[in-house]
């Protein structure tokens, strides 16, 4: 129906989360109508991000440096580590302005049915951070769904005798993702976290 170039663009756009065929067509048509330099700037920004952005060597967040801005910030409370599944969760929690500790990004959640086991996540790195640093509390902020709860329980079992282990309070919808929660809900969940 359309040229192979348009069909390829639509196919690539549908690979993005939440983008179906109709939205992909709208985005493709918008990009084609836009001035050429705007489309090329978008392509350049995407290429730059893919080439420069990597994972922080300490926490697993996204960064262009060896360590991320949060890990380098001397004003952060280094006695508390908030464990999240993905770097996008760090951004969601930072928007609340309620948390001033450090983070640890697991890179996913335990899901044996999908082949995601403890060794596939950054759990060993978390255990080493807790042993090596002066950490007194670990806040488990995995998603409030089946895999997130299983991951939180698994980590809590390994940390319970070493540090205080807390979980975000209720208020987050079960089955939801942190990335899509609003700042007020996340702020309340952080403030009302509980011991496991």
What is the meaning of each model-derived region?
Residues 49-52, 64:
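Short metal-coordination and nucleic-acid-contact micro-motifs, chiefly zinc-binding Cys/His arrays
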Residues 63-65, 76:
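Short functional micro-motifs and their immediate structural scaffolds
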Residues 1-17:
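Extended, structured, electrostatic nucleic-acid-contact surfaces
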Residues 24, 72-142:
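Extended interfacial segments that mediate partner engagement and assembly in macromolecular machines
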Residues 2, 99-100, 127-196:
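Long C-terminal interaction/binding lobes of large macromolecular proteins
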Residues 56-59, 68-71:
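Short cysteine-rich clusters marking metal-coordination/redox-active sites
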């Amino acid at each position: 129906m359309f040229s192979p170039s348009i069909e390829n663009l639509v196919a690539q756009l549908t690979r993005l989360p939440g983008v179906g065929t109709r939205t992909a067509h709208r985005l493709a048509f918008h990009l084609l109508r836009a001035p050429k330099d705007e489309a090329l700037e978008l392509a350049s920004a995407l290429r730059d991000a893919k080439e420069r952005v990597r994972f922080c060597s300490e926490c697993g967040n996204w960064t262009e440096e060896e360590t991320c801005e949060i890990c380098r910030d001397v004003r952060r409370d280094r006695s508390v580590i908030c464990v999240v599944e993905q770097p996008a969760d760090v951004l969601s929690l930072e928007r609340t302005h309620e948390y001033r500790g450090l983070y640890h990004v697991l890179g996913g959640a335990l899901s044996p049915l999908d082949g995601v086991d403890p060794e596939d996540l950054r759990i060993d790195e978390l255990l080493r951070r807790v042993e090596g640093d002066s950490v007194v509390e670990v806040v488990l902020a995995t998603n409030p769904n089946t895999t997130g709860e299983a991951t939180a329980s698994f980590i809590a079992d390994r940390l319970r005798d070493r540090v205080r282990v807390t979980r975000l309070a209720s208020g987050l919808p079960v089955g939801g993702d942190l990335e899509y929660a609003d700042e007020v809900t996340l702020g309340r969940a952080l403030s009302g976290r509980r011991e496991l």
